[in-house]
Amino acid sequence: MRVSKYLLSTQKETPANAEVISHQLMLRAGMIRRNASGLYSYLPTGLRVLRKVEAIVREEMNKAGAIEILMPMVQPADLWVETGRWDKFGPELLRFKDRHNRDFVLGPTHEEVITDLIRKEVSSYKQLPLNLYQIQTKFRDEVRPRFGVMRSREFLMKDAYSFHLDVDTMNETYEAMYQAYSNILSRMGLAFRPVLADTGSIGGSMSHEFHVLAQSGEDLIAYSTGSDYAANIEKAESPMPTEARGAATEALRLVDTPNAKTIAELVEQFGLDITKTVKTLIVKGATEEAPLVALIVRGDHELNEIKADKLDLVASPLEFAPEALIRDAIGAGPGSLGPVGLNMPVIIDHSVSVMSDFAAGANLDDKHYFGINWERDLPLAQAADIRNVVEGEPTPDGLGTYAMARGIEVGHIFQLGTNYSKSMNATVLDENGKSQVLLMGCYGVGVSRIVAAAIEQNFDDRGIVWPEAIAPFSVGILPMNMHKSHRVTDIAEQLYKDLSAVGIDVLLDDRKERPGVMFADMELIGIPHTVVIGDRNIDAGVFEYKNRRTGEKQDVPFDQIVDFLKNLQA
């Protein structure tokens, strides 16, 4: 490709409304342009990267035995009513009517459509297992689209769905997809971690997320320093206390604490050990008999809302009680709450169950109890794992301790079981002629999200530093003053033809531009390898090669340059 015949569209200035580096650089590098909130057009450079990501995804899916199909982006509402998600999905589901007043949705996901397809096309166990995938545009009407294509309303996704009659083949396909996703991200040259994950709104049992590691990542990953164990912070298991509860050494006493509304203020003002304090959070209960539930964690720990949401006594989705409701039930407000004398179900974290002589709110405004002890001052409450893990704690496999990293979720695989097939009556006849509900798996990759995540992991102060496999171009040719030198023009043109002939994606900057502008554009769009041609190079019989990632420069003889560049891509 010649720049003179290409829409490069680079920008010098960082757009003011772009919050994260990937959004900034995708705009500056001329990869995307905003059409409306959360809606983007891909310009040539962006589309080249998107297509390379898509190609790797497609190759690995085919290699894993999945079969490509294509389903409509527009879906009939009847299918969503059938599964119950018409009411459950919320405002992210864009709904509309056609000219015949029939309800439709713009698909955020395709479980309903694929299940409907399979129940009509597959009738016998002999046709199973089956794994079908598509690479298709999705739409989710995000309340606040942000971060460019990282969280846009319209996005490109690979979604696969597998169907099984037995758990064994479902597990085999799950493992194959796990490996395929690992292969996809490895081939793209990205540092990543697969992590145990919560199944979220899609539901199901087994679930893993695939995270591209980046300091800007929204998700916190807890991983083992001594094994492959890793989990989303929402899913990471807290260790059970190994120590016994200490004996009571303090008397229970009521203390005035008028200026201590938070744990931090309480600790600072009274010189307390934060591990000897607890936080009490009031949430809505799941039953009329217990409309409120108290959740208690140690002062230095954080409540894990996903874990709490799964408690039988707690209403789902988890909802914190408003202050007015708390005051009406307890007579005090947040900052002064605690377990002593609390007239509602109390669930404590396991770490709280071994505490002694601890401090908590007294359920009276501006007052706390110090020296609280279980089974002396109050009954030992029900205990559960309801907190986030902490760095340095032992991991569940016993092979290391927790460390933390930030990541960007780009893939998610689920074992759905019969969540959709049962509600949609997707069945087949087994070998005995009996009707059996299908088991399902679901496997998603955010194709456009990978593009942004790759940038968040690979950039410097000059622009994007693409991994080789997904760079828009592999090689950039920079002829210095080619419009003033026939020698430079001839050699640049010949090199361009030679590299193109061996299948290397090459961009020849044949503009009448200053060298500084040409170098800046090549570095901004992140081309991995650049070759500089000038009269001095020609006199010496060498090209000047520069590696975008390392900054390394070296002279390469004319007759060796093609093989040199081919070897770099091997």
From Swiss-Prot:
Q: State the compartments where it is located.
A: Cytoplasm
Q: What is its EC number?
A: 6.1.1.15
Q: Which PROSITE patterns match?
A: AA_TRNA_LIGASE_II (PS50862)
Q: Which residues form a coiled coil?
A: none
Record-linked InterPro entries: aa-tRNA-synt_IIb, aa-tRNA-synth_II, aa-tRNA-synth_II/BPL/LPL, Anticodon-bd, Anticodon-bd_dom_sf, Pro-tRNA-ligase_IIa, Pro-tRNA-synth_IIa_bac-type, Pro-tRNA-Synthase_IIa_type1
**Catalysed transformations (reactions):** tRNA(Pro) + L-proline + ATP = L-prolyl-tRNA(Pro) + AMP + diphosphate
Gene Ontology CC:
cytosol
Q: What's the superkingdom here? A: Bacteria
Annotated SUPFAM superfamilies: Class II aaRS ABD-related, Class II aaRS and biotin synthetases, YbaK/ProRS associated domain
- Read off the Pfam families from this record: HGTP_anticodon (PF03129), tRNA-synt_2b (PF00587), tRNA_edit (PF04073)
The family classification in the record reads: Belongs to the class-II aminoacyl-tRNA synthetase family. ProS type 1 subfamily.
| Record text about domains | Consists of three domains: the N-terminal catalytic domain, the editing domain and the C-terminal anticodon-binding domain.
Function of the protein:
Catalyzes the attachment of proline to tRNA(Pro) in a two-step reaction: proline is first activated by ATP to form Pro-AMP and then transferred to the acceptor end of tRNA(Pro). As ProRS can inadvertently accommodate and process non-cognate amino acids such as alanine and cysteine, to avoid such errors it has two additional distinct editing activities against alanine. One activity is designated as 'pretransfer' editing and involves the tRNA(Pro)-independent hydrolysis of activated Ala-AMP.
**Annotated PANTHER family:** MITOCHONDRIAL RIBOSOME PROTEIN L39/PROLYL-TRNA LIGASE FAMILY MEMBER, PROLINE--TRNA LIGASE
Q: What is the annotated quaternary arrangement, including any partners?
A: Homodimer.
Q: What is this protein called?
A: Proline--tRNA ligase
